[in-house]
């Protein structure tokens, strides 16, 4: 029992869910030519239907890989509203971010979702650096690219962040006023959780973990070692005993039902120096754009959405929309909850873009 409790504490602190035992679902992405793992994913580009286009561009010297979704009967000579979509921590563009990108494209939008720099299919070394400044720049770079895409009306640009991508979307929108309407789904405040633990469960070890992160950076600079967060293999039995839905259901989503080989929650330990001093809810008063924050009524991560929403004091148009009965992870895949979120997003973007 003591071992199980220790593993749960580690997972709550770093959300380090290992995907090494996800072979049973990797066959699904292998069957999809775009390696998409969500239900109803595009399997081929058909004229007159929603299409997917894999694109690349640079952030400094790093190659970023993204998917652009174009709506049915896309005509490059026309003008379309575009939505930038930021994926969850450890996630990739082929999972929930791709699902929402496709569903919004079905509503007539051009959408883009990219793998974060140093992660997924994108370039950058050391692998799996996970720093807030990078994630925010990923969002700004998606806006740069999609604003120049044929058919996009750059004056009508929306932003959607999911889970950790939601926190970074809030930060990006504070300064980048190209984004005219801001939305999040199941927002996760990465810095607060990396610092304090989920629901403040790891406050006692803050200084210890900062020491470890500092030591890891010193090793990197000396060229001796790239140190990563612990790579714990979580079994189904262990997951079932976890006290929080977010981590219990997250295990099944990322390791079983929607696993992708590019998705991993392992990241460089030195990243904690940046993560633990970040708070997505800081400077929320800088957001003056319309704001929609969506979360499940049963999400144990809801406190993060509520906190950020309450701090958004300078937008005259904001709404906190709860999906009745949904948990955090269920907003990633469960058809009835995804449909509620997409319908709300479509209405929000239609009115505000």
Where do the protein language model's features map onto the residues?
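Catalytic histidine-centered segment of alpha/beta-hydrolase-like enzymes
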Residues: 326-338
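Alpha/beta-hydrolase active-site loop
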Residues: 129-150
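Alpha/beta-hydrolase-fold enzymes
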Residues: 170-251
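N-terminal cap/lid segment of alpha/beta-hydrolase-fold proteins
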Residues: 30-78
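Conserved alpha/beta-hydrolase
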Residues: 103-123
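Short beta-strand element of the alpha/beta-hydrolase
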Residues: 77-88
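Short beta-strand/loop motif that positions the catalytic acidic residue
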Residues: 287, 293-295
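The serine-hydrolase catalytic nucleophile loop
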Residues: 90-102, 116, 305
């Amino acid at each position: 029992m003591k071992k199980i409790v220790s593993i749960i504490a580690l997972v709550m602190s770093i959300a380090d869910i290992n995907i090494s035992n996800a072979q049973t679902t990797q066959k699904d992405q292998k069957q999809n030519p775009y390696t998409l793992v969500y239900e109803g994913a595009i399997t081929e580009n058909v004229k007159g239907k929603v299409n997917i286009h894999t694109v690349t561009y640079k952030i400094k010297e790093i190659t970023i890989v993204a998917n652009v979704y174009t709506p049915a009967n896309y005509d490059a000579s026309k003008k379309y509203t575009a939505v930038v979509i930021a994926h969850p921590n450890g996630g990739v563009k082929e999972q929930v971010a791709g699902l929402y990108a496709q569903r919004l494209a079905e509503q007539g939008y051009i959408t883009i979702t990219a793998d974060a720099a140093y992660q997924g299919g994108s370039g950058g070394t050391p692998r799996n650096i996970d720093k807030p400044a990078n994630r925010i720049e990923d969002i700004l770079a998606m806006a740069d690219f999609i604003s120049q895409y044929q058919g996009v009306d750059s004056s009508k640009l929306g932003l959607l962040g999911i889970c950790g991508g939601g926190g970074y979307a809030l930060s990006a929108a504070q300064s980048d006023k190209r984004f005219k309407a801001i939305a999040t789904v199941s927002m996760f405040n990465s810095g607060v959780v990396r610092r304090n633990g989920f629901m403040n469960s790891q406050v006692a070890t803050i200084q210890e973990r900062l020491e470890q992160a500092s030591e890891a950076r010193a090793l990197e600079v000396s060229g001796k070692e790239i140190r990563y967060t612990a790579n714990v293999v979580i079994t189904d039995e262990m997951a079932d005993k976890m006290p929080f839905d977010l981590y219990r259901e997250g295990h099944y989503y990322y390791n079983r039902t929607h696993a992708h080989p590019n998705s991993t929650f392992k990241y460089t330990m030195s990243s904690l120096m940046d993560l633990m001093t970040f708070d997505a809810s800081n400077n929320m008063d800088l957001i003056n754009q319309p704001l929609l924050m969506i979360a499940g009524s049963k999400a144990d991560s809801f406190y993060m959405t509520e906190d950020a929403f309450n701090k958004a004091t300078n937008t005259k148009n904001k709404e906190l929309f709860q999906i009745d009965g949904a948990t955090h992870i269920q907003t990633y895949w469960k058809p009835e909850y995804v449909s509620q979120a997409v319908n709300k997003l479509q209405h929000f973007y239609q009115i505000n873009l």
